[in-house]
Amino acid sequence: MGKRKAFIDKKASQSFRLVPDNRERSERFKPTQEHLEEQQKYGVYYDDDYDYLQHMRAVNEPMKLENVHEEVEKTTIKTSGSSAFPPAPPLFGLVGALKKPEFFDEDVANALEEVTDDRNTGELEDNFITLAGGLLDERTTVYRSTRRGEDSEEEEDDDEDDEMYDDYNDDELFGEEAVGEIRVERADQRVIDNAFEELMDREYNTDQIGELDGDDYDVGGALEPNAGRLHKLINDKGPSNAEYDEELAKHYVRERMRLIEEGVIKDKEEYEIVEVDEGTNKKMKWDCESFATQYTNIYNHPTLIKEPRGLSRKALKRFDKAVEEMDIAEEDEDDDEDMEDDDDKESVFSTVSTFRPKNETPEQRSLRKKAVKEARKLRRVEKKANKTMFAEEKRKLAKGRIGQIKARPI
């Protein structure tokens, strides 16, 4: 059974979406022709029963904020003097409606006030050192300061160490050698700190210490030729172009000399004025030998062009013998060709035709075919003779070129 053609083609059809409309027929908007023209003026081309212009506002039209919350009228409820609700029933033997008298103790209140005063003020007593247990030994102070410098992030461990070492004697904890090493390290650190402070006072002012201003990002200074920062800047620049660098250097020298001549800048160096011929700048003058040496390398060895030498006596004798042998061979070939030319003077041409006459008999047909075969055979022989003759002429020309000097017209 073949495939049935669909009643509706989905690709070539239009689909519509039905949306419910809760409005009544009398409330629906019916656009007029003027309304549609005004709507198309603002780029709205929808042809439906909706007023799109109701969302349009003028540029200078003030905005008005509408309150989205519903207003609720305030209502007052009048109650009688006596309570409208009866008191709550007693719960587990306790009377909730009755209020017991509060207990007040003056000593407790004064103690609480003193505690709150101490917490709020944060002031210390005049004799807080004696209250804390007196001054500590210098060795214990040095040890604690070094330990806190190493573990500044772990405050809880520092507190535990302080409590642990308060109960022990200092002589038992530290020997004389350990205390001496701590004092030496502290002395070295103090020397470094003093040198750093002197360097800061000498190199920088108080105004130059700290973060730079908002727009002051220019940092001046001089770099050494072999400084690592200078090499890094060169590498960041990337591969340099030799021609571009040369042109940039020339431009810098020209601008600097111009400013020196105008007196804008002063230069302590002394320069010597040298006159240069203008013709040498435009085109360099080279002779053949000096110019050829500019491109000499391991692959190219330019030299002066020399005239070819003449043949030696031995070479001339060999050349004469070769010419005589070629002449003898050419004479023999010419004799053979003259004899062959006598036979080939008459060209073989076809006198028969492959066309069959209208009233041809079988005997005439067989004779005609034999004549055609004979003519084709003679034609093949003629072609072979022509091919052989052209090959011989080509060999003669090749032999004639032997010993000739190749020359090119000037």
UniProtKB/Swiss-Prot annotation:
Alphabetically ordered keywords of this record: Coiled coil
Compositional bias of kind Acidic residues: 151-165, 325-345
Biased composition (Basic and acidic residues): 357-366
Compositionally biased intervals (Basic residues): 367-378
Gene Ontology CC annotation, any one: cytosol
Classification via PANTHER family: LOW-TEMPERATURE VIABILITY PROTEIN LTV1-RELATED, PROTEIN LTV1 HOMOLOG
Name this protein carries in UniProt: Protein LTV1 homolog
